[in-house]
A protein has these predicted regions:
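Small/polar loops that bind or transfer phosphate-bearing groups
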Residues: 5, 53-57, 158
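Short glycine-rich anion-binding loops that position phosphate/pyrophosphate groups of nucleotides
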Residues: 9, 57-60, 190
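Short amphipathic alpha-helical segments
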Residues: 14-16, 64-68, 108, 179-180
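Hydrophobic, well-ordered beta-alpha structural blocks that scaffold small-molecule cofactor pockets
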Residues: 1-45, 94
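Phosphate-bearing ligand-interacting subdomains
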Residues: 32-85
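Generic structural signal for conserved hydrophobic packing positions in ordered secondary structure
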Residues: 5, 52, 74, 121-122
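Structural signal for interior beta-strand "rungs" in well-ordered beta-sheet cores
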Residues: 77-192
Length: 195
């Protein structure tokens, strides 16, 4: 497996792949000051590869790079200490960290990050390039649009719809639908412009 991006996020993916026994060939990054990461060689070669995982935390940058690279198969990494229902679906390129629970009927899009200790309950639909931060809890039947960021320790009430490119602040409690492009913070979560 090849990783794209020698970031802190890459370190966590390395831990997951090592725990799974998945061989890591090398890491690709354009920063000339990084020659290795956790003992793995970092190269500048953005060539065509058979199988890779995007290891950049920023959803926006992740999407830009994925769209311009020629990778035949985007792998996924699911930590062995994550609990994922056999009746859930996880898209290509998605990374699921330790302590995560993804329940039955949940559909997780492509190139998402479901971070440490987050929970996604039954029948949720999570779009592509979404980041569910550590300790965030998503109740059943929630829909989250592409490119959204659900902040650390936040919680989302059942059957809520969160639009595309939304940022939910750390510790927020989302109890009503959130429109596209909004940043919402607080308990209950409100559009930041309302403060």
């Amino acid at each position: 497996m090849i990783l794209y991006g020698a970031s802190g996020h890459a370190k966590v993916i390395i831990d997951i792949l090592e725990a799974l026994g998945t061989p890591i060939d090398f890491i690709v990054d354009d920063n000339p000051s990084i020659s290795s990461l956790l003992g793995y060689e970092v190269r500048r070669d953005f060539g065509t590869y058979e199988s890779a995982i995007m290891s950049i935390g920023s959803s926006h940058i992740r999407r830009q790079i994925v769209e311009r690279l020629a990778v035949k198969h985007w792998g996924k990494a699911v930590h062995p200490h994550a609990i994922v229902s056999p009746h859930a679906s996880i898209g290509e390129g998605t990374v699921v960290m330790a302590g995560v629970v993804i329940n039955s009927g949940a559909v997780i899009g492509k190139h998402c990050i479901v971070n440490t200790g987050a929970t996604i309950d039954h029948d949720c639909v999570v779009g592509d390039y979404v980041h569910i931060a550590p300790g965030a809890h998503i109740s059943g039947g929630v829909v989250i649009g592409n490119g959204s960021w659900i902040g650390v320790g936040s919680c989302v009430k059942q059957k809520i719809k969160i639009g595309k490119s939304v940022t939910i602040g750390a510790g927020a409690a989302v109890v009503k639908d959130i429109q596209d492009g909004v940043t919402a913070v607080g308990v209950p979560a409100k559009n930041i412009i309302e403060y």
